[in-house]
Amino acid sequence: MKRLISCLTIICALNASAAAETTSNPCSRWISFLKPVCQRIHQTWAEGHDDMYFSGYAWHNRYVYSNEKIKSYNETAWGGGLGKSLFDEKGNWHGLYAIAFLDSHRHLEPAVGYAYLKTASVNKDLKAGLGYSVLVTSRVDYDNVPIPGALPWAALFYKRITIAATYIPGSSREGHENGNVLYMLGKISL
């Protein structure tokens, strides 16, 4: 519950910060080479559609984990969250999100981040995208310390519905297995 409140506090702080900035030059205090990053994040927040995220599956790589270990893991990573997203002038997707889900040990794991996908249109309603996400998360097994990360991300967009996946790399060292998880999530643009 504390982590959920922390995520909501971060979202509210970002919203208050965005509202406090002047609309004419919201990134004026950023270092010059980071201004494009600020401007894209601000554009996504200000012009993006509201999104509702849901998750439900985390596949643990069968080539890394034993059957016994897999049976002990939670692969139904139920959770959800909120976000903002938009397709830019080139048709590529940008998203800001805050989600929480049940991790492999059935503990609540929050994450907030930004994602970018280079997209290709299959037809008018269907797009495919490949890109990355940069995020901050925290886990019980790491004493709930905020952990920054970057992950690959792929998605299929159909009208307002999106199915996305990321692969969390890890170690397969005997007795120290972690990561190596395909995490699936969905999104509905409201």
From Swiss-Prot:
Domain of life: Bacteria
Subcellular compartments: Cell outer membrane
EC class (word): transferase
Pfam families cross-referenced by the UniProt entry: PagP
SUPFAM superfamilies, per the entry: OMPA-like
InterPro entries assigned to the protein according to its UniProt record, in alphabetical order: LipidA_acyl_PagP (IPR009746), OMP/PagP_b-brl (IPR011250)
UniProt site (Role in lipopolysaccharide recognition): K69
Catalytic activity as recorded in UniProt: a lipid A + a 1,2-diacyl-sn-glycero-3-phosphocholine = a hepta-acyl lipid A + a 2-acyl-sn-glycero-3-phosphocholine; a lipid IVA + a 1,2-diacyl-sn-glycero-3-phosphocholine = a lipid IVB + a 2-acyl-sn-glycero-3-phosphocholine; a lipid IIA + a 1,2-diacyl-sn-glycero-3-phosphocholine = a lipid IIB + a 2-acyl-sn-glycero-3-phosphocholine
Subunit (UniProt): Homodimer.
NCBIfam families assigned: PRK11045.1
Name under which the protein is recorded: Lipid A acyltransferase PagP
The organism of origin for this protein: Legionella pneumophila serogroup 1 (strain 2300/99 Alcoy)
Gene that encodes the chain: pagP
